[in-house]
Amino acid sequence: MPKHIGIVACSAEGAALCYRTLCAEAPVKMGTHTHPEVSMHTYPLSDYMTHIRSGNWTQVAELMLSSVQKLATMGAEFAVCPDNTIHQAFDLVTEKSPIPWLHIAETVAQEARSRGFQNLALTGTKYLMTSFVYPNILEKSNISCRIPEGDKQEKIDTIIFEELVNGVFLEGSRLYFNQVIQEFKDKGYDVDVLTLVPTYPL
């Protein structure tokens, strides 16, 4: 019997992609038109951004914990959060959570190991790229992680918050991401971990 999944959402675009992906891929294992029961809860992105910008991860954790408590009440048996940035509050949440969570970086590490990847590049919000979220997890698997240089971090962050979270992805931005990815590839990195809301247009 598949478990009831609870999605702790942050940005609408990221949460929508997570939900669509679950429902699109589940039938491969579960049968036509079949997917697990899924519930979702989200506070406005602005609520999260107020605390993210001030570096108040305790308050970010409180929002996440409130969401997961609502999801547990709905019957969710475990939680996923498709937002990489707020995983900086992950440990503060899980110690009080009524249900278990999947950690997004642990899932990436598992996939990297299965494919034999040793050198990963990481692109995402500046809050994520300069955080411990991925390095701490990847190091346990002897996987290295590299982020873009400072000026590139700022441009990527701007594109995410001015375009991607609003469902917009301009051609110039798409080409810029492809350029950054190609630079990492030329330096010998196995793959770029695109920790951003919808990147499928790439």
Task: Enumerate the predicted regions with their spans.
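Non-catalytic structural scaffold of enzyme domains
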Residues: 1-202
